[in-house]
Amino acid sequence: MAWWLQNNLRMIQNNLRDIDAGMDVDAWFAEIESSHCNCVMVGAGGITSFYPTNLPYQTRSPYLKGDLLGEIVRVCHAHGVRVIARFDFSKTHERLLAEHPEWYYVSEAGEHLHYNDTAATCVCGEYQQRLSIEILREVLENYPVDGIFFNMFGFQTKDYSNVEHGICNCPACRKAYLDYCGRDLPQGQDWKTDETYAAFKEQVVGDLLLRIRRAVKAINPEVAICTYHHKGVDIIREESNSAVDRPLPFFLYSASENCQSAAGSWGGEKTMLNCAINAVDIFYRFQGVSPELTKIRLYENMAAGSQLDFCIIGDFADYPDRAGVAAMREVFGVHARNEALYGKFQSLARVLLYRPRKGDPEYLGWFNLLKDGHVLFDVLDHPAAVEHPERAAGYAALIVPDPARAPAAMLRAAREGGAKLLFSGLVDGEATEALRLLGVEWRTTLRNTRAAYLSTADKTRFPSFPERDWVILDREFGVFSGAQGALPLVHSAMFGPPERCFGHETGEERGLLRSADGTSAAFAFRLGRLYHDYGYADHRLLALDALRDLAPEAFLLRTNAPTCVEVFWNGLPDGRMFLQLLNLSGFNGVTVEPCIPVPNVEICLPCAVTGVHPLEGAPQPAVEAGGAQTRLRFAPLARYQAFVLDV
């Protein structure tokens, strides 16, 4: 087995600055060793070389006196710590621009992208297409690093101040796009939504990563390749980060979402490193986020079956935020003491959630509501659904946000495997396969439903609404004919002044469609987006009632836990089971403070549990066995508690 498939890393990335080229490696490693760390990521080449490069298109750090990369590899390997070398080919020192302007990004206005003393390169240019591989070759032939990582890989159009500079118009891009589709590059704002250009970018990035893979593996097949992409890599990297200008709502499940999307899509083939970025933002690299947020992100990493990854800027010696480092060490210690249990989980989930694209709010809303509703589920990312549609088989239910993008082969595999299909955001006629499966025809789309409602008067289908008959609707609503349905549309009426607030009429339109054979259902509005944006429990309850009505076997465990308790339940290779409870209290929507112990939590599991073994001295839960079910009653929950279950 390749070393990265062991899925047990506790990695620290010191994002090296030029001035760190002269750091005290022994003092640095003492910090690494005290952090239970078994892998480091350090700067090697690209923008700055942290070793004595002989290549004219690299720039050595002016503070480099010896060979920092060589020293780090020597010290780390002497103590059994792996080293992943970091490269950033997105920029070079600007001195090279005058000699080779063809390597660099060019805006629509014909301008290069400068930032401080660097200039942005283009992924289509010779520097990234050919010379980057020569830089990798120089490192791999001279240093026994365990892996390589590429930062800011692909088509980069924003600078560090988050300013958008637009599509690259360099000669290499223009030629490559013309060869790809016979057209000129899209201009203005059109490039952001142009599907042909998006496919072109994916092909360019994927082809380059595959060429890099062939070159790297020819030198040393044991070197792991890692970046923010799935193509040609051994380790997919993502980040749980923060940004001061990022719109609310704050997505607390970031680490779980990143890890679950990789595990469900590429498990057994690739592993994931989801980096808990300590910095508040790129602008504020020297203050960390709340230490409690760092703990949540790292605990979610390991609870979701992934590895640990933490990043700070520069060396520990002059890093001014020791609180975040202490939080990291707490979680790394838990993982290190129980390493044999982590990274080898076997999913018990009966629900599969399709991810149409990263960051899609309809999808994120469904991720949120399933987590909040304590439904166990896996995630299948769109590229994996295209390459491996068979991975959708074997579930009780497949949930499909953005039905128009869903691959037909994935839907077919899910149905043939016995899954019921639940579509969400079916608001127009573009999702032809979903319409066929539902047996409906699209009539029209209501673009503005502000002040409209959905009726939950049918309490047999919507038992979660004993005292509430209307639930708010907003944004688009699809009108269809030919299907059975529920959730009648209550049309908008007057909403002001109070004396005129009447006149609502219930129409024939339905918010929940269902096929005649009972194998498919669809929300004719963006339910996930409403939950993502507004957070009303009503939309979560609509979703869970509909899912329970469609596929009751999708619900494995029962619990009275509040939404602030994230539940993970998996199988272990030896036949035992692993239950993890993450207390997310202390989060008020923006601020993350220490958690409040959550009392009186009970979980009912659909199996006979014969023994419970708490980790890290957690209190023993009360066990009530009853045939094929077991009820566990827990002492007040701390931030993270885990239990090995004999079954």
Task: For each feature predicted by the language model, list its residue ranges.
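Conserved, mostly hydrophobic/aromatic
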Residues: 11, 32, 76, 132, ...
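Proline-aspartate-enriched helix->loop->beta-strand connector
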Residues: 37, 144-145, 153, 221
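N-terminal small/glycine-rich loop or linker at the start of catalytic domains
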Residues: 1-15, 106-120, 267-282
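Active-site-adjacent "subsite" loops/lids of carbohydrate-active enzymes
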Residues: 85, 89-143, 173-202, 207-211
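Carbohydrate-binding surfaces of carbohydrate-active enzymes
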Residues: 6-8, 83, 190, 194-647
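Short, acidic/polar
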Residues: 18-34, 128-139, 290-298, 385
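Aromatic-lined carbohydrate-binding/catalytic grooves of carbohydrate-active enzymes
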Residues: 28-68, 91-110, 114-116, 157-169, ...
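Mature N-terminal, pre-catalytic/accessory segment of carbohydrate-active enzymes
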Residues: 1-50, 54-86, 222, 344-348, ...
